């Protein structure tokens, strides 16, 4: 279940000077506005992704750096907004100045083999800051490259493709669509199989805007007791949930909820264990935000090539005492209801709220955010060397407020079991408690009753 894969592996990465890759052909010079779903405070950050690839003798010694560089330039002809820069207009409205300047690219070599990373590639990755170099001056939201890509050759002939995205531009499906296009061009295509669609106006606020749904996810919650996660002493660990672990969690599911999804039961369990580990006061509100892809919730559905942000943050809210003292079914009911809240009207209401309330950040105080990327397809991206050994988020806890978010990433362990790996980021004291609580549940010896969690007292 628990992976202690660490950053003990040390190696040297030698980088070339960063360069800008511009579109291979002239592209329109224009201004394109982001949608009111893209343009929210909680997405104004850079999100890191990493893919590992084995050597493939059928590639005949081709250089992955040169192949991918050329493919990026060709792909940017179609995705030319990525080659531009963001700027703000009236009321902080974000827009892309399509300048054609290009995306940031770093070529590198590492004196390490893929095998040395171990037989279970998963976050946290050693020397991540060397595999995805933070080029000075590149990490801002405005007037900076919208993508930073580093390709690192490995001693064994494999390579690592790492990417950092300005999240206001795309969500996971949109980013994978772009990466897939780069892979197709790298393999000789003349155009992506799915052509990009901008159409960000589809997710703009109405005129006049009117908030028609309840949005607890954007409530302003004062951090009266200093319960925002401290940024020092943060520990990163990953946890694997295969058939055995999921079955163990399902033993706590009441009969009327037996049709719940793996996402739902896993989210309920992790939210509960995490809340116990950080020890909020019993009367304080705690939240779990579930990222829900809303593409299929529209009628008609959003165009298949749409690569903007098209998700919502529906939230379940309760008190720490209720969450921790009730059986798992209590949290599970809350999570199930939360996911069903997202409709076309809900998305329109969020867009309207952004305009009315000044594009607020989602609530982070005593909040846990989960994002399921098991079907996103990061690992399917093929530049000619086959599918990735690992493909997905580079670490947990990313975001404007570190430590809040976890990703559910598809994973096969060394036993050959398919499952989900979840990177968790917590302060050291909380991580120890989290591991004990989760281990207790998985061993089936957790007594989910009122006595078990009596440690939560007003004195804390």
Curated annotation (Swiss-Prot):
<dbReference type="GO" id="GO:1901787">
    <property type="term" value="P:benzoyl-CoA metabolic process"/>
</dbReference>
<dbReference type="GO" id="GO:0102720">
    <property type="term" value="F:acetyl-coenzyme A:acetyl alcohol acetyltransferase activity"/>
</dbReference>
<comment type="pathway">
    <text>Aromatic compound metabolism; benzoyl-CoA degradation.</text>
</comment>
<keyword id="KW-0012">Acyltransferase</keyword>
<comment type="function">
    <text>Involved in the production of volatile organic compounds (VOCs), including floral volatile benzenoids and phenylpropanoids (FVBP), in flowers of fragrant cultivars (e.g. cv. Mitchell and cv. V26), scent attracting pollinators (e.g. the night-active hawkmoth pollinator Manduca sexta). Acyltransferase that catalyzes the transfer of benzoyl and acetyl moieties to a large variety of potential substrate alcohols, and involved in the formation of volatile esters benzyl benzoate and phenylethyl benzoate from benzoyl-CoA.</text>
</comment>
<comment type="similarity">
    <text>Belongs to the plant acyltransferase family.</text>
</comment>
<protein>
    <recommendedName>
        <fullName>Benzyl alcohol O-benzoyltransferase</fullName>
        <ecNumber>2.3.1.196</ecNumber>
        <ecNumber>2.3.1.-</ecNumber>
        <ecNumber>2.3.1.224</ecNumber>
    </recommendedName>
</protein>
<dbReference type="GO" id="GO:0006084">
    <property type="term" value="P:acetyl-CoA metabolic process"/>
</dbReference>
<dbReference type="InterPro" id="IPR050898">
    <property type="entry name" value="Plant_acyltransferase"/>
</dbReference>
<dbReference type="InterPro" id="IPR023213">
    <property type="entry name" value="CAT-like_dom_sf"/>
</dbReference>
<keyword id="KW-0808">Transferase</keyword>
<dbReference type="GO" id="GO:0007623">
    <property type="term" value="P:circadian rhythm"/>
</dbReference>
<feature type="active site" description="Proton acceptor">
    <location>
        <position position="167"/>
    </location>
</feature>
<feature type="active site" description="Proton acceptor">
    <location>
        <position position="382"/>
    </location>
</feature>
<dbReference type="Pfam" id="PF02458">
    <property type="entry name" value="Transferase"/>
</dbReference>
<dbReference type="GO" id="GO:0010597">
    <property type="term" value="P:green leaf volatile biosynthetic process"/>
</dbReference>
């Amino acid at each position: 279940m628990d992976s202690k894969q660490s950053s003990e592996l040390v190696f040297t990465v030698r980088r070339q000077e960063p360069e800008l890759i511009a579109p291979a052909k002239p592209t329109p010079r224009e201004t394109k506005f982001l949608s009111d779903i893209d343009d929210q405070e909680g997405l104004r950050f850079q999100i890191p992704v990493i893919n590992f690839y084995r050597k493939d003798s059928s590639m005949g010694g081709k250089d992955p750096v040169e192949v991918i560089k050329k493919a990026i330039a060709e792909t940017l002809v179609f995705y030319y907004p990525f080659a531009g820069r963001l700027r703000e207009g009236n009321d902080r409205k974000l827009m892309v100045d399509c300048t054609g300047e290009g995306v940031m690219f770093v070529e590198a070599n590492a004196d390490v083999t893929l095998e040395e990373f171990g037989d279970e590639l998963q976050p946290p990755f050693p020397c991540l800051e060397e595999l995805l170099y933070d080029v000075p001056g590149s990490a801002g939201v405005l007037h900076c490259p919208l993508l930073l890509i580093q390709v690192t050759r490995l001693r064994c002939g494999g390579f690592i493709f790492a990417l950092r995205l300005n999240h206001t531009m795309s969500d996971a499906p949109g980013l994978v669509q772009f990466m897939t296009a780069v892979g197709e061009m790298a393999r000789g295509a003349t155009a992506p199989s799915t052509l990009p669609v901008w159409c960000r106006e589809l997710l703009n606020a109405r005129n006049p805007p009117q908030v028609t749904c309840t949005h607890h996810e954007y409530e302003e919650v004062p951090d009266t007791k200093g319960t925002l996660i401290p940024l020092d002493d943060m520990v990163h660990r990953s946890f694997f949930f295969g058939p055995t672990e999921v079955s163990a969690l399902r033993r706590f599911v009441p009969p009327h909820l037996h049709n719940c999804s793996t996402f739902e039961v896993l989210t309920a369990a992790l939210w509960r264990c995490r809340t116990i580990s950080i020890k909020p006061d019993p009367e304080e509100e705690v939240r779990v935000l579930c990222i829900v892809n809303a593409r299929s919730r529209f009628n008609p559905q959003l165009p298949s090539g749409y690569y903007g942000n098209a998700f919502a943050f529906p939230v379940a809210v309760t008190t720490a005492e209720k969450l921790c003292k009730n059986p798992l079914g209590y949290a599970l009911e809350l999570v199930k209801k939360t996911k069903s809240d997202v409709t076309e009207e809900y998305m329109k209401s969020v867009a309207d709220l952004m305009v009315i309330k000044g594009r607020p950040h989602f609530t982070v105080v005593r909040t846990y955010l989960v994002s399921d990327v098991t079907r996103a397809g990061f690992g399917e991206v093929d530049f000619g060397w086959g599918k990735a050994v690992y493909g997905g988020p580079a670490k947990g806890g990313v975001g404007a407020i570190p430590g809040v978010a976890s990703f559910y990433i598809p994973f096969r362990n060394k036993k050959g079991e398919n499952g989900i790996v979840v990177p968790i980021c917590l302060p050291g004291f909380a991580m120890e408690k989290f591991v004990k609580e989760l281990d207790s549940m998985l061993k089936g010896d957790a007594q989910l009753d009122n006595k078990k969690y009596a440690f939560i007292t007003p004195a804390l």
